[in-house]
C-alpha cells in the first residue's frame, strides 16, 4: 500500500486535530508521551492553532526540562507571559516538584520558625507528607489557583515524560485526600488550639488559625472542582504523542489504559518523525526505517480505529521559532501529503 493510499484510506475519523479546534467547550488539554517524541513541538503547535479560534490561550510546561523557552526562543518563568508575535497566546514554565513549605507559607503559615511555639507548622508538614505524592500535588494546586484566577479560555499542558504525566493527573485526588484529612484534624483539635491561644485567636507571628483553615478549604474546593472538570470529556482531553516504534507504541497503549482508568478523555494521537522516501530514493536506511514505521502505523490504525491519528513527517531541520512552529502546526489541521513511494 502506498503512503498516499494509507493517508486517504477510509477512516472512521479524520487524521487531524481539527476536532479540538471545533470543540468550543474545551478548557483543558494535556499533551504527553515518551521523551524525545516531539511532545513540546506538538503542544506548542496545537497552542498556536487554538489561538486562532479562541480568545485567550495559555501554554504551561510541567516538564522540569522546560523546553518552551527553547521552542519559542523566549524566556518563560512561573508567571504567565505573552509569547512574542501573539496577542492572545501566553506561556509559563512551572516546577512540578514544588515544596510543601512554600504552600504553608502561602496559606498563612511560615513553617516551624513562626509556629515554633506550638510546632503546628511541623505537625501539618508531617501530616501532609504522610500522603504519597502530596509535595508535587501542592505545587500543582498553586498552579491551578493561579490559572483559575487568570481566566484563560483554554489551557494546554506540555507535560513531563509519560511516568510523570500520569502521576501529575493523580494530583487532584491526592491533594483532595490530604486537605480533607487536615480539615478533619482541624475540626477535632481546633477547639483545643483556640483554648490554648486564648482570646488572641492567633498563632505566633500574628497568623489566625481560622484564616489558615479557610484557605486550605478553599484550596480543597478548587481541587475538587478541577478534578471534576478533568473527568468531563466536554472540558478536558489528552493528546498522546508518539513515534512509530515499538517502545513508543507500548508506552502510548499503557498511557491510554491508565487515562481511561482515570476517566480522562483521550481520542487523538499524533505520530511524529515519519519518513516518506521517494520511490527513486537511494537511501537504504530510509527505506528500511519506513518499512518498520509502516508496520507500527498499521498497528496504531488497528488498535485506535476510533481515534484521530495524525501523521507528521520527519523534517530536515529543528522546529524552533515562531515561523517554523506555525508551519508545523498547519500540518496538525491540514494532513501532510507525502510523495509517492
Swiss-Prot record:
The active site is at 63. Pfam families: ArsA_ATPase (PF02374). ATP binds at residues 34-41, 245, 272. Keywords: ATP-binding, Cytoplasm, Endoplasmic reticulum, Hydrolase, Metal-binding, Nucleotide-binding, Transport, Zinc. It is found in: Cytoplasm; Endoplasmic reticulum. One of its GO terms (biological process) is tail-anchored membrane protein insertion into ER membrane. Its EC number is 3.6.-.-. InterPro entries: Anion-transp_ATPase-like_dom, ATPase_ArsA/GET3, ATPase_ArsA/GET3_euk, P-loop_NTPase. It is an enzyme of class 3 (hydrolase). GO terms for cellular component: GET complex. GO terms for molecular function: ATP binding; ATP hydrolysis activity; metal ion binding. Zn(2+) binds at residues 283, 286. Its main location: cytoplasm. SUPFAM superfamilies: P-loop containing nucleoside triphosphate hydrolases (SSF52540). NCBIfam families: GET3_arsA_TRC40. Belongs to the arsA ATPase family. Homodimer. ATPase required for the post-translational delivery of tail-anchored (TA) proteins to the endoplasmic reticulum. Recognizes and selectively binds the transmembrane domain of TA proteins in the cytosol. This complex then targets to the endoplasmic reticulum by membrane-bound receptors, where the tail-anchored protein is released for insertion. This process is regulated by ATP binding and hydrolysis. ATP binding drives the homodimer towards the closed dimer state, facilitating recognition of newly synthesized TA membrane proteins. ATP hydrolysis is required for insertion. This is ATPase GET3. It comes from Paracoccidioides lutzii (strain ATCC MYA-826 / Pb01). The lineage of its organism: Eukaryota, Fungi, Dikarya, Ascomycota, Pezizomycotina.
